[in-house]
Amino acid sequence: MFGLDPTLLFLLFFCLFAACAFEFVNGFHDTANAVATVIYTHSLKPTQAVVWSGFMNFLGLLTGGVGVTMSIIGLLPTELLIDSNVYHSMAMALSLLISAILWNLGTWYLGIPASSSHTLIGSIIGIGVGHALLPENSNKGISAINWDKAIEIGQALLLSPLFGFALAIILMYILKKTVQNKAIFKEPKKNTPPPLWIRAILVTTCTLVSFFHGRNDGQKGIGLVMVILIAFLPGYFAVNTNLDLVEVKTSLIQVRQIVAKIDTVPLSEKEVESYHKVLKAGDELDTILVDGLTTAKLSVDQKFQIRKAALTINKNAKKLIESESVALSATDLNALKRATAGKKAPFFSFGASSSSGIAGITDFAPAWVMWLVALSLGLGTMV
């Protein structure tokens, strides 16, 4: 099956099972965050709260697109995602899964409120550091890790609790000053639900926390599964085989035309390097696509070349877009963003999801992957 020998096929299914187990553990590990208040205040019965939370996690993941998914995959060094040696990729996938699952299970068993997101991101960065320290990668070292993306995600993880803490204090202060009925600030009586309006607020917040947990944390599971599929079956999942290559070529032409307008004189050394990388990768991608080949006819090596070129273009084009030294009109900057990162995804994108522009080559997830992870997360939440 899939051209894999029995051992690799077994390991593929084992890794997929482990990824589902991670999402399952993620579900029952994080359920308390959403349902604690509605159960404690008797707004909902425990079974009602847990089932409702599970359903909203499931729905949130299915409608969330792949934005967070690609941020997770983007943490890995590009070389790891285009390694044609399946055993290297297998070691990466197993290391990631085993470390994340063991920590999640351990913290759940000991009752430690640890974050699944921190666990997964830490595992991915650990893999990147381990890969960078291998003798054959000594020339690049830890610079091969996507530190820009790691810092971006790290800032979000650090700011999230601070934002929640500050906003909770402000809202509590406003309620204390404006609500006349002080009974709502006292400990709830046994088996007595709160006033209807308080109950409605608590159920609404439980619903929204569960829904957005699925949209955010659930997508990390999709990223995990996609890393496994790219590692074991690059011929099927290294690039999006359903993408319209005419659209890709149109986006590529736009990128090359706009980047060619940039005056390199005021740019720093690193920005000039990014400039040349975009143009070189654009030439490589155009060479592969010039004959109008469909991805179904391309070899695995060619798909890896397409993936590498697309990742290189997007990564370095983003640096140029964000640079203050790049003198481009607002129209050109917006066109470059659309041609590389694609249009902003709709809030609801049910089922299979992918980006547009050149990002659409690598930023995608099949419908069955989203359903698999959504079911794992939803069922785990109900445990």
How would you describe each model-predicted region?
Residues 1-15, 70-91, 180-191, 228, ...:
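Helix-loop-helix hairpins and the membrane-proximal interhelical loops
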Residues 10, 14-25, 52-55, 204-215, ...:
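Residue-level signal for short hydrophobic patches within transmembrane helices
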Residues 16, 20-31, 57-70, 96, ...:
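Transmembrane alpha-helical segments of multi-pass membrane transport proteins and ion-pumping complexes
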Residues 37-45, 121-134, 225-233:
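Interfacial segments of multi-pass membrane proteins
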Residues 42-54:
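Membrane-interface alpha-helices at helix entry/exit sites of multi-pass transporters
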Residues 113, 125, 129, 141-216, ...:
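Glycine-rich, mobile lid/loop segments that gate access to catalytic sites or pores
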Residues 114-122:
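Cytoplasmic-side transmembrane-helix entry/capping segments in multi-pass membrane proteins
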Residues 234-368:
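Low-complexity, proline/glycine-enriched hydrophobic segments characteristic of transmembrane helices
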